[in-house]
Amino acid sequence: MGILDIDALSVSYGAISAVRDVSIEVGEGQVVGLIGPNGAGKTTTLAAISGLLKPGSGSIRFNGNDTTGKPPDEMLRRGMALVPEHRRLFKTLSVRENLLVGGATASSREREERISEAFDLFPVLESKQSTAAGFLSGGEAQQLAIARALMSDPSLLLMDEPSLGLAPTLVNVVFELIERLGEDGRTLLIVEQNATRMLKAADRAYVMRSGAIVASGTGAELLDRDDLFEEFVGGQ
């Protein structure tokens, strides 16, 4: 049993089936990727895990507890944090203030310790800690979104398309950060369209197509599947 166990998860939008019979396991300390083409159901799966959507059937167990259909605020209290595709920063608040919001449930001492850790992990944020989030570049804003999610010290961090819309050099920065978080023992489940980079960083990955899991394995195993890239991922 992993820190997150999803069994036969299905989600529908009215009569449209978006996710069908999806089963995923995330072990503690693992970096797990969820890859596939647009419309595969990756973001919908992540939304159901985080409590943003209620599944039609199947189960979600987080830290050994049944959390199927639990709301996002409860998932946060249980130790799950989400970095959404659209970063949703408080644009008029400074970098530091955004971090404080992320650590709202921690004590003052814990918040300051975590801010210090965030600045160690994201040096660019320390130099811009008084800057309003709305004035950050895309790469800086993505780093702030990740840092803010880490302020709750989650046992599982979910990321939805963390490299989306970033220049190639910034994509490298994001994946170097993901690799570092993995080396530090963080547990991550990441939805990502950049399949090659995700598989290089992942301990394990799942490939989705048309709402279903069509392949799974270690990152290295899936990188060797040329047929998989051509048929399911589109040669990314």
Where are each of the predicted segments found?
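Conserved ABC transporter NBD signature motif
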Residues: 58-66, 78, 111-113, 117
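Helix-to-loop junction immediately C-terminal to a conserved catalytic motif
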Residues: 50
